[in-house]
């Protein structure tokens, strides 16, 4: 297991992070579980803690965040609004995949604005909505090229759509990221200018309404006054060895004491079930929250 740690502060003042203590606490949690768990934490845009970041992890539906940003950038470049309507033939959609959109729209031809497709992917992790946007708006290759302008080229790869991965589950490993790259992307989303203000705010708001994976990073945060979370999950298949290929969550959290942090947790090749994988993520989230919220008045 490769462990890494880093801590810096741009303003030269005191840090909100006891990086060594966090690193040790997270490493102890990771060691409790039968799988590879990678973690990256960025606090206030400066302090960084990573565990098992040297390896890459299947993103699964986390890549729908990358897709959303690529769609928004393409629409910015072409002067298009997210109100632009896309029409889909129901027969072209996959009835077997996860798709709240397909359940909620029974008409033979489904016409929806792009912003609704994005909401389906970001809030509900809808696979059909994602496939439609890859086919008609921005391809997986073009998404990969755009994200490479935001993140180090070697830190991630997007090669396949949800449809591609459904046809061959091994392809999930080709859509990969380091935990730090995922944490960097969500951190930049909330602190930098990546696309037009209106579209960027739209993506941020959608992530704050995410309905999936509330038993992961969000679990220890829900119900705490003044705490906000925006996140995107990814969930994988069971492979031929009976392992859970991936169980992920990437989040941006604001605390009432002024601390803001991005946290990425990726679980790979897990010899347990989804409940145990979610528990590992929630425990890591709880440890981070406990330390960073310590000085809330």
What are these regions (language model features)?
Residues 3-6:
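C-terminal motif of bacterial Sec signal peptides marking the signal peptidase cleavage site
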Residues 13-33, 135-136, 140-141, 188-227, ...:
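Structured C-terminal helix/loop/strand segments within mature extracytoplasmic catalytic/sensor domains
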Residues 32-57:
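Short, conserved catalytic-motif segment at the N-terminal edge
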Residues 36, 110, 131-194:
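Mid-domain, small-residue-enriched loop/turn segments at the edges of structured enzyme/sensor domains
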Residues 93-131:
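Conserved catalytic neighborhood of penicillin-recognizing serine enzymes
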Residues 8-11:
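Bacterial signal peptide processing site
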Residues 73-93, 140-144, 196-200:
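Short, well-structured active-site flanking segments
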